[in-house]
């Protein structure tokens, strides 16, 4: 019976095809010959489809004269006119040429589909892989800190002043790799070291609340690292299967300017590393294998790093089912690192407080199976992730009972529908995340679940691009331990909230685009912020199970102006922005413990809801690349950000410390007129000039004085201590006095492209050997020198 039914269905389908006119073919890049996925094929009569994962398409038509248009972002549009007879099957292969004299920056993060950057409704910066390679990047955070409006402090990203110092727990900026979150399940820490710097296509940074499309941690923005597919153009250049990249480097850390800071004598600390990538296509399989080995003696005493990382990216395109592809991506990290939080003193700034270094032997890995199916104008994707983080912590060679382990099971199903006739694209999906965590410092075993549904609609009307999105999220954390809150003994914490966003982009002139957007954000506290009880680097960290979720919104009005000089193209972007947060969560330094019994007189950190806040400001940036003339090319990324940030209720008591003393923003701040651990002015630029085979580049980063920190850091209790009881943390006030005019750092680099296979570089970071800090009581690296050799065969 089943065979008969199958035969009848087959006959019915064939009869429909026999009584229809069909055009089919394959669409490729004119220069690289690579298949183009998602090209829109639209007939004049209104029907349409899109090319599949192999670049192939098929479209039913009525008989007679037809006019078909092939449209793809970043490529010249092609229109074909022809006559198709009754029941004819016409094969038409198309080769599209790129619009080479446009900036041609295509992004996916703003709406989870490909768009030109000038047409999106939010502010976004894009980093290309050349900057990552040429800066001798051993950790992607280095490049993130070069982006206008972005700062990285202790591994936490801060966009336009949206975050202060979060002590490495929780994040308001969601970091993704190929649309998948890369944040630990317990502490909410970004797993920067797991990111394969050797296989990056581009980095996209959304500035502003993006929770509607990406979820809780996107309250302040999104950083999406997009990995590269094997390039057919590069493969065709080689006699061997695929192509291989090998980058090696060796560097030295210079002595600090002040002799008091030189804890290592005349011996120079060194760092060295190698990273490699092999990419190939085997029939219908795209495969990339990569890895990195990095050894760093460290510029601080005891902060030694031994890191090994390996990765695989694979995609198989089904030969049996058109439009079906599936694969597996994975990263494996094995490392031993030392970390310190606070210096011993201003004159011993590269020595940790009380010589206490936390050494972490950690294994981190993610395994990501996925499946994608494209049919006509529909796209279905199912992405899954297993992320495991294991940290074995010790202090001075002894187990400190602060080990932690977490596992994440993550699933995201997404459906996209492109209705070409009405210029509408619908993106909808559901996300599920389960976290299992075990750690003494988080009071045993904890479980977290996060379920959400989301949708976004994008519509093009003439020169307008409109966008609307919504999401609902529900969080639950369950702990083995019960906590007494408002007289109730509980071990379950839950919260849920809908969030919305909307935006519009208008093309006012040929190269002028005006945009406006508004979006809500929501963030549930991490397990670390709720439950942590630990001593790290000599400082106590206290739990706060009474912590509430934070929420907020952001809005902006911006204009993007295209500029062109010969074959050099770029954009100037100006944006005004406004953000408000309710119940903002911040780690705050105060006397949270009992002064008579707790270590360090009860001094330490705790996450608290510090009230309602506002941040508004202005940002100007420029991003461009291309040739000035036949032999000279110029790449530039630059920007200035002004931020005015303050508490909306500075006198409100939001916590109690010490002997039950009320804590408000006013009495806990060194400057209560602004928010803590933030700047008001940030300026950055990176410029690279290439003449024939030689290149020279300079990077500059400036921030003004961080006027507001936790007030207790500035008191005699902390700076001078109490003789015989507490030695204090000397030099915080002195260092701040010396930084009153702000800090700036200049990096330089030279490059020589010997031939297509070999490139050599010389990189000097902090060339002026300046003393600078990103927060109180932590001195950043003195000058470093590095030589690099990049091979591509």
Predicted features, each with a name:
Residues 371, 420-431, 435, 439-579, ...:
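Structural signature of Gram-negative outer-membrane beta-barrels, strongest in the C-terminal barrel
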Residues 28-32, 39-44, 71-75, 85, ...:
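Short, acidic, small-residue-rich periplasmic hinge/interaction motif at the N-terminus
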Residues 124, 141-180, 184:
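Extracytoplasmic beta-strand/coil segments of soluble accessory domains associated
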Residues 384-385, 389-393, 515, 548-604, ...:
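Membrane-embedded beta-barrel scaffold of Gram-negative outer-membrane proteins
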Residues 296-311, 315-373, 378-380, 386-410, ...:
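Flexible loop and strand-edge segments within Gram-negative outer membrane beta-barrel domains
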Residues 57-60, 180-209:
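Short acidic/polar hinge/loop motifs at secondary-structure boundaries
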Residues 92, 194-245:
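A beta-strand signature from Gram-negative outer-membrane beta-barrel systems
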Residues 247, 577-580, 603-712:
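Gram-negative outer-membrane beta-barrel transporters
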